[in-house]
Curated annotation (Swiss-Prot):
InterPro entries: DNA-dir_RpoC_beta_prime, DNA-dir_RpoC_beta_prime_bact, RNA_pol_asu, RNA_pol_N, RNA_pol_Rpb1_1, RNA_pol_Rpb1_3, RNA_pol_Rpb1_3_sf, RNA_pol_Rpb1_4. It is an enzyme of class 2 (transferase). This is DNA-directed RNA polymerase subunit beta'. Signal peptide: none annotated. Zn(2+) 2 binds at C811, C885, C892, C895. GO terms for biological process: DNA-templated transcription.
Length: 1415
């Protein structure tokens, strides 16, 4: 009985196996034999007549255990009483059948065989150990070449390969015993077992000190690393060659009889059978002393069979089964989505679950869901059985079963009792963030569909068009508790991604609330006064006052002191009704709803109520406004017909005007005044402006207020109400219905020049319809592809961040990052208050210009403090950030700040990494699904000027202006900025001026809002003459570096610089334009005294002729920028992935590494050499090679600052980290990622991105190993590095020097310290091979590892319980230790001592550990 109890997984009394870590290492032959219960000698599986397993076969009962519980094979011993007896007839132990899942067997191999993982998994471990190439190894292993193992006194060298003939010749020459050479895995095994690891490591270290060059040290380091890992892990190299092959238990490779006498079997049995057959044949051949060549062939076949068993298809052809299907080997069992890790360990199927279609349940409360009776009966069966038994209605489970099956009335009563206050979990796939699973209290309903509360739809992303949801029942009391306290829908009002309420009315509800809070002039009852809400309701019911009439009413309010007061408001009956639902609170006054409520406003109202009135009040409020919204929308009866789509009368005049404009552009193009590209850009611009104008007219007409004959205001247009309230439809969609559809994009993103002038109400012409199919089709294709991409991005993010958990309250770091308002193209896109909200201040925040403290250091910035910061016009704030957190594992609560979904400081144990990954990944899918709604409509129109967004005084920084012949100011510098300063001297906006921009304002001038500040050409980059003179062409040779483009349409030609490097003659050309002094014929010089020359880049269009006189400020040439591509998240998702994968962009920008002056050096082949001479003499000058023909925005003698771009393009994030540091990198990543999401109107809090970037910065690269064991170029964790360096410094040795490196999320996940987590992510075999050689230990710190080994995760309640357990265990340990010490001292007193105890004896009682061995 005892055994059964201890191995039964559902037995609560069985002691749980406790362990703190899991180690993986190589198995020695002895170890394999110790696992084995017997040798498998025959390839037979089972006897096909009796269906009994064959003796000594792959399913042998003697080795693996009985087939039926407590019954031997021949049937001599049956039942429990013979437990443990071994039958003398069939040799089977009488025990549980379950042991067939755990007992292993083995095969004694007749010849050693190399393990394919250590041979072929790159870099080949066997190859590294022996310092041989993989090709040579394979030649030896597959019996092509001999290898010299012991050269003796001959001229041969160790490890030399020889062919058969050479071997025989050498034997003739030196004699057979003069040297040893061998072939096959035996040879490799001999060589491996001869290796003295410590000696090798010493030699390699010596070599490393002397090695020079690039490759040699690298190679030595690689070998040294693997030798060290063998030394540390206690593995022996020869264990990579197998002499004994383990056989996994038969139940894990089952053989199942199908009907009709056929069998289904696991592929492994086939693979094992091949191995056994070949092995037995080889044994026989060796006994028979067969010719060498035959034995050798058999050995090679054995090697191939074992290879196929371990990893089919890794080498040679794939071994296929009967139906030409590749057999699944042991490696394939682990790999991929269907492998052991992802299919069975991380994703299990769950008992007590059901699924059904969902329908809306508007009469439910927020914490309820409707559960069909039939489903509930099935799900809660065990509970019902136990309750039936407790009530004495049934005495056995069988009886209870019958009762339930008959659905007797008492069963329904009991079901009611069972379900009361027993929450269930509802889940909708795909579960993209944690709000995809929430708990509800079930309400029993008739019918077969689950009823879902309408307000939680947005969290689940559910709608009622046939979606299905799954129900799960939390069984244990703890699970029910967690479901209620943590997962109840009422506890998840705020979104973890941005902290805004996610329980927000949508669609009908919004429309109803909008209609309720409308105010219209001239309605019945206007100007009446009411004393109370009840009176208003009375008047409404009597029809004396209209819902939208303006009235005066007295309303109860709470003042600042908390007293109840009555205030008078001018309002409408509708708003009064809504105000009556607001909880009474000074912070939620009636003014909150005394206005026209759109969707955003409703969200703000809910947010305010949640922040100030608490959770309970706000949940009740949400339920009430939901009911009101539905009711009022239903009463209003808003709907629309085709006549509600208004087409503005001014549409055709506008269109015709633009048509004339476009004709004019065509004419200019024919006359050659503009290029094809410029014409295209201008036409696209004109049409896009036209489309906007028509849309504007339509919106103006549709939203215009109209009056009836009596002078009362009419109801607004229904379509306008729907769109304006935020219920459904966008201005872009309305534009397509009633304005003009506008420009369309081709599938590659280019915009088609001819727009669609019709709208859907007028109907499209055939050509227009054809043009619009591109966009529609691209939308659908995009969706399908990007759902997968987005899911994969989320998977990688979760994997990299899964072990980032809040572990401590405060790490006490001094580091912080600076937060300031996010500005995009001069416009504030997210104010400072928004960015610091929910963060901890790292320094006191002061009112500018005084020392009044707004927020003290270490305080959490809540809404109130954020508003104070905003009002005080603080420019930037130092805040704590997960990036700079110095917690050993995970992050600390102070650096993370507020838990966005709770609104308080984050709790210890919160899995912030996963929350961050889900918050970034979840919108990815949403965005992908949003591309086609607008159907590929192009957003044309490039901005070409900038207007002041604020009033203030203009201030130029680093001005560098030139006035051209027309008196316009042209920007000539790279670093010029224009700032707008307000009266208080605070900077309100700064704009970077691009080279060639025209400035319309003067320094110190005061500007109003919308004053045009400067303009630029969005399509080309001009190159401008600094001084007047004569242009002279250098190396601009027609046909080599210049091509003349003649436009077929116009007959005009223009000169374009072509790629001169691709022509045979053009290798050394340096095309440029020099400005000459017409008097002296010398080149003109600039202030720095350098000759003025303009190097040309490829595709530049020349605007002057050779020898033409130019004036200062004239355009010499124009470089075209890329045409207007449509911005679509298509660019977005890959962009986000590219940022997190830290890929180097193709033509990445070159960033200056220190401040200094630019010098152009001697050119090298087709690259130009730029050096920066630093201002600081202690630094060396840095050289950059830039491909010729790339536009370089700096000139000889320019001063550049550290971090300036010397070559345009996207910067590589690694460069930013190296040159400007972690904070600059974080800012870059945050801005770039947020930019993508902002375009789609998705809000994500910065801290999520910071958490992911923190996980990407976990590793350090060793630059100099000092006197530590770390090797140069190795990547180590910060914790490891500190530990090693501390140890070195304690011993007075030189510490290693390292710098942080940025890893992409895939790389970072694969390099995590936990091999279980890495193996379950990607490249399983590679990760496991590496881990086993190093003898890695998995400390089980992350979530994934713990899920895989079947424990509670160390986050949330799991973390708390494990902490409590640890405390208890330590306490017990202390007691046990003191008891033991007491007992020992008592024993010592009792024992007589003769003479002095020798304390210096060998046995000092210390266990030899790694630590005291080093001393």
């Amino acid at each position: 009985m005892n055994q059964e109890l201890s191995t039964n997984p559902f037995n609560p009394v069985a002691p749980v196996k406790t362990f703190d870590e899991i180690k993986i290492s190589l198995a020695s032959p002895e170890r394999i034999l110790s696992w084995s219960y017997g040798e498998i000698k025959k390839p037979e599986t089972i006897n096909y007549r009796t269906f009994k397993p064959e003796r000594d076969g792959l399913f042998c009962a003697r080795i693996f255990g009985p087939i039926k519980d407590y019954e031997c094979l021949c049937g001599k011993y049956k039942r429990m009483k013979y437990r443990g007896v071994v039958c003398e007839k069939c040799g089977v132990e009488v025990t549980l059948q379950k042991v067939r899942r755990e007992r292993m067997g083995h095969i004694e191999l007749a010849a050693p065989v190399a393990h394919i993982w250590f041979l072929k998994s790159l870099p080949s471990r066997i190859g590294l150990m022996l310092d041989m190439t993989l090709r040579d190894l394979e030649r030896i292993l597959y019996f092509e070449n001999y290898v010299v193992i012991e050269p003796g006194l001959t001229d041969l060298t160790y490890g030399q390969l020889m062919t058969e003939e050479e071997f025989l010749d050498a034997q003739d020459q030196y004699g057979a015993d003069a040297f040893t050479a061998n072939i096959g895995a035996e040879a490799i095994r001999e060589m491996l077992s001869a290796i003295d690891l410590e000696q090798t490591a010493e030699t390699l270290r010596e070599e490393l000190k002397e090695a020079t060059g690039e490759l040699k040290p690298k190679k030595i380091i690689k070998r040294l690393k693997i030798v060290e890992s063998f030394l540390e892990s206690g593995n022996r190299p020869e264990w990579m060659i197998l002499t004994v092959l383990p056989v996994i238990p038969p139940e894990l490779r089952p053989l199942v009889p199908l009907d009709g006498g056929r069998f289904a079997t696991s592929d492994l049995n086939d693979l094992y059978r091949r191995v056994i057959n070949r092995n037995n044949r080889l044994k026989r051949l060796i006994e028979l002393r067969a010719p060498d060549i035959i034995v050798r062939n058999e050995k090679r076949m054995l090697q191939e069979a074992v290879d196929a068993l371990f990893d089919n298809g890794r080498r040679g052809r794939v071994i296929t089964g009967t139906n030409k299907r590749p057999l699944k080997s042991l490696s394939d069992m682990l790999k991929g989505k269907q492998g052991r890790f992802r299919q069975n360990l991380l994703g299990k199927r769950v008992d007590f679950s059901g699924r059904s279609v969902i329908v809306t349940g508007p009469e439910l409360k927020l914490h309820q869901c409707g559960l069909p009776k039939k489903m509930a009966l099935e799900l809660f069966k065990p509970f019902i059985y136990s309750r039936l038994e407790a009530k004495g209605l049934s005495s056995t489970v069988k009886q209870a079963k019958k009762l339930v099956e008959k659905e007797r009335p008492e069963v329904w009563d009991i079901l009611d009792e069972v379900i009361r206050e027993h929450p269930v979990l509802l889940n909708r796939a795909p579960t993209l963030h944690r709000l995809g699973i929430q708990a509800f209290e079930p309400i029993l309903i008739e019918g077969k569909a689950i009823q879902l509360h309408p307000l939680v739809c947005s969290a689940f992303n559910a709608d009622f068009d046939g979606d299905q949801m799954a129900v799960h029942v939390p069984l244990s009391l703890e699970a029910q508790l967690e479901a209620r306290v943590l997962m109840m829908s009422t506890n998840n009002v705020l979104s973890p991604a941005n902290g805004a309420p996610i329980i927000v009315p949508s669609q009908d509800m919004v429309l109803g609330l909008y209609y309720t809070t409308m105010e219209r002039r001239g309605m019945k009852g206007e100007g009446m006064a009411f004393s109370s809400v009840e009176e208003v309701e009375h008047a409404l019911a009597a029809g004396e006052v209209h819902l939208h009439a303006t009235i005066t009413a007295r309303i109860k309010q709470i003042d600042e002191e908390g007293n109840e007061v009555v205030k008078r408001y001018q309002t409408t009956p509708g708003r009064l009704r809504l105000g009556n639902l607001l909880p009474l609170n000074a912070k939620a006054p009636f003014e909150l709803v005394n206005r026209l409520l759109r969707k955003k406003d409703v969200q703000n109202v809910i947010d305010t109520v949640y922040r100030y009135c608490g959770q309970k009040e706000s949940v009740i409020f949400c339920d009430q406004i939901m009911g009101m919204g539905f009711r009022e929308a239903f009463k209003a009866g808003i709907s629309f017909g085709k006549d509600d789509m208004l087409i503005p009368d001014t549409k055709w005049p506008i269109v015709n005007e633009v048509r004339d404009q476009v004709k004019e552009f065509e004419q200019q193009y024919m006359d050659g005044l503009i290029t094809q590209g410029e014409k295209y850009n201008k036409v696209v611009d004109a049409w896009s402006k036209c489309s906007d104008k028509v849309a504007g007219e339509m919106m103006a007409e549709i939203s215009a207020v109209r009056y009836d004959d009596a002078g009362a205001e009419k109801e607004p247009n229904s379509v306008y109400m729907m769109s304006h309230s935020g219920a459904r439809g966008s201005p872009a969609q309305m534009k397509q219905l009633g304005g003009m559809r506008g420009l369309m994009a081709k599938p590659n993103g280019e915009i088609i020049e001819t727009p669609i002038i019709s709208n859907f109400k007028e109907g499209l012409t055939v050509l227009e319809y054809f043009n619009s199919t591109h966009g529609a089709r691209k939308g659908l294709a995009d969706t399908a592809l990007k759902t997968a991409n987005s899911g994969y991005l989320t998977r990688r993010l979760v994997d990299v961040a899964q072990d980032c958990i809040v572990r401590t309250h405060d790490c006490g770091t001094e580091n912080a990052i600076t937060a300031s308002a996010a500005v995009n193209e001069g416009e504030v896109v997210s104010p400072l208050a928004e960015r610091v909200l929910g963060r901890v201040a790292a320094e006191d925040i002061l009112v500018p210009g005084s020392d009044e403290v707004i927020v003290a250091r270490g305080e959490l910035i809540d809404e109130r403090r954020a508003d104070l910061v905003d009002q005080a016009n603080v420019a930037s704030v130092r805040i704590r950030s997960p990036l700079t957190c110095e917690a050993e594992e995970g992050v600390c609560a102070m650096c993370y700040g507020r838990d966005l979904a709770r609104g308080t400081l984050v709790n210890i144990g919160e899995a912030v990494g996963i929350i961050a990954a889900q918050s970034i990944g979840e919108p990815g899918t949403q965005l992908t699904m949003r591309t086609f709604h607008i159907g590929g409509i192009a957003q044309g129109g490039q901005q070409s000027f900038l207007e002041a967004s604020q009033e203030g005084r203009i201030e130029f920084r680093n001005p560098n202006l030139l006035e051209n012949a027309n008196g316009e100011q042209i920007v000539m510098g790279r670093n010029m900025q224009l700032a707008i300063i307000d009266e208080a001297g605070q900077e309100r906006a700064t704009h970077k001026l691009t080279y060639g921009a025209k400035v319309h304002v003067k320094d110190g001038q005061t500007v109003k809002r919308a004053t045009r500040l400067f303009e630029w050409d969005p399509y080309t980059l001009p190159i401008i003459a600094e001084k007047a003179g004569v242009a002279r062409f250098v190396d601009l040779v027609s046909g080599i570096s210049v091509r003349e483009d003649t436009d077929e349409a116009t007959g005009m030609t223009q000169k374009i610089v072509s790629d001169w490097r691709s022509t045979p003659k053009g290798g050394d050309l340096k095309p440029e334009i020099i400005i000459m002094n017409p008097e002296t014929g010398d080149p003109m010089r600039n202030e720095a005294g350098n000759p003025i020359s303009y190097p040309m880049s490829v595709e530049a269009i020349l605007s002057v002729e050779d020898g033409q006189t130019v004036r200062a400020g004239d355009v010499v040439a124009r470089i075209p920028r890329e045409g207007a591509r449509t911005k679509d998240i298509t660019g977005g998702l890959p962009r986000v992935a590219e940022l997190f994968e830290a890929r180097r962009p193709k033509d990445h920008a070159i960033i200056a590494e220190n401040d200094g002056y630019v010098r152009f050096g001697k050119d090298y082949k087709n690259k130009r050499r730029i050096t920066i001479e630093p201002v600081d003499d202690t630094l060396n000058s840095v050289e950059y090679m830039v491909p010729k023909g790339k536009h370089i925005p700096v000139q000889e003698g320019d001063f550049v600052q550290k971090g300036d771009y010397i070559m345009d393009g996207n910067p590589a994030p690694h460069d930013i980290l190296r040159i400007l540091g972690v904070e600059a990198l974080a800012n870059y990543m945050i801005d770039e990622v947020q930019e993508v999401y902002r375009l789609q109107g998705v809000k994500i809090n910065d801290k999520h991105i910071e958490v992911i970037v923190r996980q990407m910065l976990q590793k350090y690269e060793i630059l100099d190993s000092g006197e530590t064991t770390l090797l140069k170029g190795e990547h180590v964790d910060k914790a490891e590095l500190d530990e090693v360096n501390q140890k070195a410094m304690d011993h007075g040795m030189r510490p290693a020097h390292a710098e942080p490196i940025l890893l992409g999320i895939t790389k970072a996940s694969l390099q995590t310290r936990s091999f279980i987590s890495a193996a379950s992510f990607q490249e399983t075999t590679r990760v496991l091979t590496e881990a086993s050689v190093q003898g890695k230990r998995d400390k089980l710190v992350g979530l994934k590892e713990n899920v895989i080994v079947g424990r509670l995760i160390p986050a949330g309640t799991g973390g708390a319980t494990s902490r409590v357990k640890k405390i208890a265990h330590d306490r017990d340990q202390k007691v046990i230790d003191t008891r033991r010490a007491e007992a020992e001292s008592a024993a010592a007193l009792a024992a007589p001592t003769d003479g002095v105890i020798d304390l210096g004896s060998e046995d000092s009682g210390l266990v030899e550990t790694v630590e005291n061995r080093e001393e």
